[in-house]
């Protein structure tokens, strides 16, 4: 089976002052603090979370 694509996501803005659902999306992606980078699988669920908090993130494929 082919390896799934991954997306590299970096939190570039702080979560302070954001609404709770946006903080939950960041936690769901595995982001803990500013400048923290994680690799997540390219799934519709992860894409939805990335789109919701795109103003806080830098995304590389």
From Swiss-Prot:
Keywords: Ribonucleoprotein, Ribosomal protein. One of its GO terms (cellular component) is cytosolic large ribosomal subunit. GO terms for biological process: translation. Coiled coil: none annotated. GO terms for molecular function: structural constituent of ribosome. The keyword Amino-acid biosynthesis does not apply. The keyword Ribonucleoprotein applies. Pfam families: Ribosomal_L30. Belongs to the universal ribosomal protein uL30 family. Part of the 50S ribosomal subunit. This is Large ribosomal subunit protein uL30. It comes from Neisseria meningitidis serogroup B (strain ATCC BAA-335 / MC58). The lineage of its organism: Bacteria, Pseudomonadati, Pseudomonadota, Betaproteobacteria, Neisseriales. The gene is rpmD.
């Amino acid at each position: 089976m082919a390896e799934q694509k991954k997306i590299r996501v970096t939190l570039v803005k702080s979560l302070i002052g954001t609404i709770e659902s946006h903080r939950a999306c960041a936690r769901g992606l595995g982001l803990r603090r500013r400048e923290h980078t994680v690799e997540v699988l390219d799934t519709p669920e992860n894409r939805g979370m990335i789109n919701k908090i795109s103003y806080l993130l830098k995304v590389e494929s």
